[in-house]
Each structure stands twice: as structure tokens, then as C-alpha cells.
Amino acid sequence: MDRRIFGLENEYGVTCVFRGQRRLSPDEVARYLFRRVVSWGRSSNVFLKNGARLYLDVGSHPEYATPECDSVPDLVTHDKAGERILEGLLVEAERRLREEGIAGDIHLFKNNTDSAGNSYGCHENYLVGRHGEFSRLADVLVPFLVSRQILCGAGKVLQTPRGAVYCISQRAEHIWESVSSATTRSRPIINTRDEPHADAERFRRLHVIVGDSNMSETTMLLKLGSTDLVLRMIEAGVVLRDMSLENPIRAIREVSHDMTCQRRIKLANGREVSALDIQREYYSKAVEFVERRGGDAVAKRVLDLWGRTLLAIETEDLELVAREIDWVTKFVLIDRFRLKHGLSLASPRVAELDLKYHDIHRDRGLYYRMERAGLVERVTRDLDIFEAKSVPPQTTRARLRGEFIKRAQEKRRDFTVDWVHLKLNDQAQRTVLCKDPFRSVDDRVDKLIASM
């Protein structure tokens, strides 16, 4: 696929505290957060004029689904725009709490686990052709995705019966199947539920739910860009060595608990390899592929960071990527904090630091304090993120949805939209079906907008 449609869905952890004590239940916090949304959208499940979807997911987790993007840097920008939109709701909700005499700070965390052991996700979406054999795609991808956490894990201090350990991935402990149609009960690596949100005869949506939510823009770029390159190789018929794992679910935990990434995991054919070996295999094939086929600046940046991350792990010189890879950035931060204050990894102050890294409030979150201090690399710019809060991507179907919503709101017209349908709720009940996610111009939508 020369052009691919990408999308990201992030669920956020939410809490309201006053002097360190929980003040409101997650349900109550969510109600305050979404009050403004419900007042204009008459629902806690809405599409926005930038083409994105904002809603309350199971368990009172705010979720932001980006509009369809056709480039990875665009997707990073729109994912960050989702953070800013939620930060705006947070500030508004805190103001309303104060007006009602309730003291407390609301925190939104872009992470994947809470203190009670619940998990919530970051779901990646990649459009693939319908003609390919989906089971083969999954077979090749599972070993890649199990080992990919060494590139893009968000890092976590995990309290175990044997003491605290630093894990590479937050999500790894909560994955129970390789491939399945469920998302919550069994939490697979790849979700096979067939909902393309596009022409089902031409397209299929690959729904990857194994990844961690990332604060780092560069980690996000690597996560999405490396996966796109592996998909391109599969689509082009590149022969990849069989890396099928004997037990992917055991392997994903073993990889997460081994910061050296050298621990051997068993393949289905009896061989034993490390996560580093598996990633090296995919990486070297991707380098050859791009050299042969040619690649744009994004592919080259992805390959550069991919190679440097593997080198940093191999040589145990994590500082090489401490500005670019979430789990490394956070580990270095925690390590320095512990040394400075003489703390063990099990210290509550370390747990607090771990959580603060993911706080999306730019005045409180540790990641954003590091960003302001110039301690992390970037992919996008604040100006582009600000624009993406209200302007959809201009080269995908999201543009049509965004324009329709914007005009309907300006004209105070009642409307219903989803990923594929645009509908005016007037007597004629006019509906336009947009089945091609690559199409950003459509006469039928123009006519519908002009009729308002």
C-alpha cells in the first residue's frame, strides 16, 4: 500500500485528589470532565470538527480516537492534539469544581495501568488490503509486536511479591491471547474483529492493542513507523524468517521483565532467541527493503532511531536514546532521582514519579517539564498541535467529516456522524456514505454542506 490510513485510540486514566487523598470517584470526575461536551453534543460520545472522536469508554476512561491520517508525523500531531483537548476539559472541570466549593485537582494520565491493577489501552489502527491473507499477516506480526516493546514500551515500576522491578512495558502483564476478536476480556495482541470503517470489499483494518500509550513523540514515531515498514514488507512479499513463538503470552512478559533484552525466548521450531535478536531480524530486513525500494525522510528517521535503540540496548549504553525512547527516558529519570534521594525502587516517592511522568497537564506532568527544559526530542511543533485541535487532516476522509461538522454547528443544524456516515437530521434525512478513507474531496458532501 503506497499510502496507508493510520489511526490511534488512547484511553486515559483519571483521578481527583485533594492533599493526596482521592476526592471523587472516577465516574464523578468523568461527569465533570464531559459536562461541556454533553452540553453541546447531547452525548458523551461525539465527533469533533477536527474529525476525531471523543467519548467515555468502559470504566469512566476518557478516550480520544484520532481522525484518519495518511502519514505517521500527522498522526503524532493529532494524537497530541487529543491530549490538549482533554487538558482543556480538565482545566474547565477544575474551575467548575472550585465554583461548587469542591477543592481538588483532577489528573489525567496517558498510561495503561492504575494502582488497582486495571488496564486500559492504546489501540493502533492500520488500513490493509482485503486481498491479503489476514492470518499470515498476524503470524508474521505477532513475534514483531511481542518484541517491539523494547523500542516503544512506556516503562513501569511493578510491585511484585519479590519486590519492585522496572518493566519495559505497562501493557505486557495484561495481554492474554495472541489473536482474538475480544478487546477487554482476553486482551489479545491483535484484535481480529472485522470492522474496516471503509469499503469492506477492498479494505481491512488491522487493530493492534498490545502497545503502550506514549508520551514521547519520537517513541510514537518509531512504534507506528516500524510497524508500517513491517506491513509494507509483508505486502510486498518479502520473505521473512519464521520467528513464530512457542508461547507469545509468556514471551511478552519475559521480555518486559528483562531490561537487557538478552533473555532467550523459545520459538515454535525449538530455537531460542532474544527480543533483541528478533528485532534485529526485522530491522535488517527493513533497511534492505528501504534501500531497494527507496524511502522518504520519515522512513529514514524511523530506521535511524530503530537502529540506534537496538545499539543502545546491545551495548548497555541507554543514554544513546534517553531523549527519544519513553521507557529509557523514564528509567534514567527514576534512576537519577533514586540516587539523589537514596531511595529504593519500591519507595512510594518513586511510584509517584512514575505516575507523574504520564500526567498530561503541561504545568504538572514530568514529561512536559522535561520537554520545556529541552531534554527530549520532538517530531511535531506546538503550533501544529494547536491547529490540529480544530482542523482535520486535509488529505483523508477526515476533512469531509470535519467540514460537515463545522458547518452544521455554525448553522445550528441537527446532525449525526460516524466514521463512514454523514447525516442531516432534517425531514429529508439526507445521508452521505463515505466508504473511501483516502478520499478528501466529494461532490455529494459539498452539496450536503451547501444545502444547510
Curated annotation (Swiss-Prot):
GO terms assigned for molecular function: ATP binding; ligase activity, forming carbon-nitrogen bonds; magnesium ion binding; ubiquitin-like protein transferase activity
Record-annotated active site: D57
Matches recorded under Pfam families: Pup_ligase
Keyword Ligase: yes
Residues that bind ATP: R53, T66, W419
Top enzyme class: ligase
Any single GO BP term: protein pupylation
Keyword presence, Metal-binding: yes
Keywords per UniProt: ATP-binding, Ligase, Magnesium, Metal-binding, Nucleotide-binding, Ubl conjugation pathway
Enzyme Commission (EC) number: 6.3.1.19
Catalytic activity: ATP + [prokaryotic ubiquitin-like protein]-L-glutamate + [protein]-L-lysine = ADP + phosphate + N(6)-([prokaryotic ubiquitin-like protein]-gamma-L-glutamyl)-[protein]-L-lysine
Binding site for Mg(2+): E9, Y55, E63
Pathway: Protein degradation; proteasomal Pup-dependent pathway; Protein modification; protein pupylation
Other observations noted: The reaction mechanism probably proceeds via the activation of Pup by phosphorylation of its C-terminal glutamate, which is then subject to nucleophilic attack by the substrate lysine, resulting in an isopeptide bond and the release of phosphate as a good leaving group.
PANTHER family: PUP DEAMIDASE/DEPUPYLASE, PUP--PROTEIN LIGASE
UniProt cross-references to NCBIfam families, sorted A to Z: pupylate_PafA (TIGR03686)
Family note: Belongs to the Pup ligase/Pup deamidase family. Pup-conjugating enzyme subfamily.
Purpose of the protein: Catalyzes the covalent attachment of the prokaryotic ubiquitin-like protein modifier Pup to the proteasomal substrate proteins, thereby targeting them for proteasomal degradation. This tagging system is termed pupylation. The ligation reaction involves the side-chain carboxylate of the C-terminal glutamate of Pup and the side-chain amino group of a substrate lysine.
Name recorded for this polypeptide: Pup--protein ligase
Organism from which the protein derives: Parafrankia sp. (strain EAN1pec)
